[in-house]
Amino acid sequence: MKMTFRWFGKDYDTVSLDHIRQIPGVEGIVGALYHIPVGEVWPLEDILELKRQVNKNGFHLEVIESVNVHEDIKLGLPSRERYIENYKQTIRNLSKAGVKVICYNFMPIFDWTRSDLAKRRPDGSTVLAYEKQKVEQIDPEEMIRRIENGANGFLLPGWEPERLKTIKPLFALYKGVTEDDLLDHLRYFLEQIVPVAEECGIQMAIHPDDPPWSVFGLPRIVTNKENLKKIINMVNSPANGLTLCSGSLGANPDNDIPDIFRYFLRMGRVPFVHVRNIEIHTNGDFEETSHRSCDGSLNICEIVKVLHESDFQGYIRPDHGRMIWGEQARPGYGLYDRALGIMYLLGIWDSLENEKRKREGDKTCSQSIQV
């Protein structure tokens, strides 16, 4: 298991690589090029500059999150061909820089969706939260205004200004697009890009929808175990993989997260994992919490145990954290609580490794634990 940390770059992040370097166990940075519009080719020289910054601080850059998919591809428009060719070239350029995994999603228009970016918890921290009634009572444009107002001036991943400026025409284009249509468009996309990824030694890793249900009437197709099976079977290749996110899938209590992790880990199709906890309320609303199992509705200990039992060799990162100790940062992406999350996850992993060594009669010093 390779521990990583998402970093938005020196121009977009309050968290520095120097600070991330002080978190024990972090080996790599999960990064992206945020100045390149969605659908355009990522220039090799820009990728190499990002890699240089990351390597200079002792980290690897082997996971990219995300190379976002242009709406024309999701809509299945004739113009998708240009954007698919651009995507292929971006894959090739990333492979030249040593990237191994590309995380992406296939959510129409909106990426992750929340009603609040700073809901106050009983302990005084603030978190991302989703209240269904609030979302149902506003229109998409109001949602955009709320997200922008709550972003503390930061660019939020998945909420690119160039896309959100065309919100009304986009909704008109999606009128009548069904889940089956969206699945067909994803299949076409995968049939085009997976062979390129395979040639380049890269694993594509689709991220679940967040939350895992329809928002504003838009179709969602990456929401449960059955959806994930369909996607894996669209193109039977190791390069067609999954990003398993406990918090995204876990927002629906019908999703058995340890079972989902166990099933796809056994298939060898999970190169990347996000772990976070959420508290699900009786009415279906949810809010994010610390990573501790007892603080939310998900059994993080059991999830890490499944990773350990599966001999997970891929990449993992703590997902959204609370805003604590007066930190002012991009909502969900401060330094302190994500660092706490890493120590919790590694603590569980180290404990499992220690028990494994005891069973095997190995008294090797704990410093030899590989994470």
UniProtKB/Swiss-Prot annotation:
Cofactor(s) essential for the protein: Fe(2+); Mn(2+)
What EC number(s) is this enzyme filed under? 4.2.1.8
Protein name, as recorded: Mannonate dehydratase
Report the InterPro entries cross-referenced here. Man_deHydtase, Xyl_isomerase-like_sf
- What keywords are assigned to this protein? Iron, Lyase, Manganese
Pathway note? Carbohydrate metabolism; pentose and glucuronate interconversion
- Top-down, what is the taxonomic lineage of the species of origin? Bacteria, Bacillati, Bacillota, Bacilli, Bacillales
Its annotated function is as follows: Catalyzes the dehydration of D-mannonate.
* Stored NCBIfam families: PRK03906.1, uxuA
- Catalyzed reactions: D-mannonate = 2-dehydro-3-deoxy-D-gluconate + H2O
Query: Pfam families per the record?
Result: UxuA
Say which domain of life the source belongs to.
Bacteria
HAMAP family in the cross-refs = UxuA (MF_00106)
Biological processes annotated in GO: D-glucuronate catabolic process
Give the first-level EC class, as a single word. Answer: lyase
Q: List the disulfide bonds.
A: none
Molecular-function annotations in GO:
ferrous iron binding; manganese ion binding; mannonate dehydratase activity
In which family does this protein belong, per the annotation?
Belongs to the mannonate dehydratase family.
